[in-house]
A protein has these predicted regions:
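Residue-level recognition of oxygen-bearing side chains
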Residues: 65, 96, 103, 146, ...
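Hydrophobic alpha-helix immediately C-terminal to the catalytic Tyr-X-X-X-Lys motif of short-chain
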Residues: 159, 163, 167, 197, ...
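C-terminal substrate-binding subdomain of Rossmann-fold SDR/epimerase-dehydratase oxidoreductases
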Residues: 3, 29, 58, 195, ...
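Short histidine/acidic/glycine/proline-rich micro-motifs that form metal-
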Residues: 35, 182-185, 215-216, 276-277
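N-terminal Rossmann-like NAD(P)+-binding domain of SDR-like oxidoreductases, especially those catalyzing
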Residues: 1-183, 308, 313-316, 322-339
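The catalytic Tyr-centered alpha-helix of NAD(P)H-dependent dehydrogenases
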Residues: 137, 149-156, 186, 190, ...
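Residues that form or flank phosphate/diphosphate-binding pockets in enzymes
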Residues: 12, 38-39, 64, 188, ...
Length: 339
């Protein structure tokens, strides 16, 4: 089995590659990644010497380069993690999100049509559904929930999903889509809530929390997400969307306080900053379909997952300190410095 994994130097993509090579040592994985600010080649160090792994620096919008890779690898499957994914950045510069997330997806699907594949899988997000009210804890996103995007990021991901489904109906392309809740775990880029709070707390820096911190997210440990995608790839029904959720709803402010307590840091580090434009209030996924059809359930309780995540950041300071000392530092000052 040969699988092309796009965006494999990023957070979820790299964890998926590690999972697949551990579970299927005879599979071959070709990883392509543009290596933007969030793609870190050092993340893939554990598999660089694996004879069944290949890395190619490539933009999914580069049609000629993508076609060349398909000709060389003859993939059976393609899993698309490649995406611009940070909401704040999409508000500052929507164009790059539309380019990568929509047009890049089109290039990949055209390559799949041209060269033939057994499965194309699109990794999407629960953010395409919009948000849920805080006073209705009985409501959850299902696969039938209408798309109702709130940011340029979520609009670009929803557009890509619709394009994937259109290619399935129009051209018969064998596709599946997964929409997941917020992930956390090793190798998470420090612009996102949990790694940002861990890194700042370890450096005794302010912990910037949007608004009042009441926003609720459903948290999914990244390894559980990878196992779900594995199941969908091998056993999911073509043309279907599967929601993947962690059954771990938490307020942002509670997450930050948990991290402070785990690291022995004072809550006085918490600094409330001007809220994000159009900030969604609550995300909550109903994963009944993937459980019913494929037997998947999240295995990691949040208390265990956050502890493992904190320990990973303690043990791998060099990885994230290199990141926050570079271009990211300027971005951080722009986003939080005057709020």
């Amino acid at each position: 089995m040969i699988i092309i994994v796009t965006g494999g130097a990023g957070f979820i993509g790299s964890n998926f590659i590690f999972h697949m090579l551990r579970k299927y040592p005879d599979y071959r994985i070709a990883c392509l990644d543009k290596l933007t600010y969030a793609g870190n080649l050092s993340t893939l160090a554990p598999v660089m010497d694996n004879p069944n792994f290949r890395f190619v620096k490539l933009d999914i919008c580069d049609r000629e380069g993508v076609y060349r890779l398909f000709e060389e690898e003859h993939p059976d499957m393609v899993v698309n993690f490649a995406a611009e994914s940070h909401v704040d950045r999409s508000i500052e510069n929507p164009e790059v999100f539309l380019q990568t997330n929509i047009l890049g997806t089109q290039v990949l699907m055209d390559a799949c049509r041209k060269y033939g594949i057994r499965r194309y899988h699109q990794v999407s997000t629960d953010e395409v559904y919009g948000d849920l009210p805080l006073d209705r804890p009985d409501l959850f996103f299902t696969e039938e929930t209408p798309i109702h995007t709130s940011s340029p990021y979520s609009a670009s991901k929803a557009s890509a999903d619709l394009l994937v489904l259109a290619y399935h109906r129009t051209y018969g392309l064998p596709v599946t889509i997964s929409r997941c809740s917020n992930n956390y775990g090793p190798y998470h880029f420090p612009e996102k809530l949990i790694p940002l709070m861990i890194a700042n707390a370890l450096n005794n820096k302010p912990l910037p929390v949007y608004g009042t911190g009441e926003n609720v997210r459903d948290w999914l440990y990244v390894e559980d997400h990878c196992k779900a995608i594995d199941l969908i790839l091998h056993n999911g029904r073509v043309g279907e969307v599967y929601n993947i959720g962690g059954h771990n709803e938490m307020r942002n402010i509670d997450i930050v306080k948990i991290i402070c307590k785990a690291l022995g840091k004072p809550e006085s580090l918490i600094t409330y900053v001007t809220d994000r434009k159009g900030h969604d209030m609550r995300y909550a996924i109903d994963p009944t379909k993937i459980h019913r059809e494929l037997g998947w359930l999240p295995e990691t309780k949040f208390a265990d997952g956050i502890q493992k995540t904190i320990e990973w950041y303690l043990d791998n300071r060099e990885w994230w300190e290199t990141i926050i000392s570079g271009e990211y530092r300027d971005y951080y000052e722009k986003m939080y410095g005057n709020r």
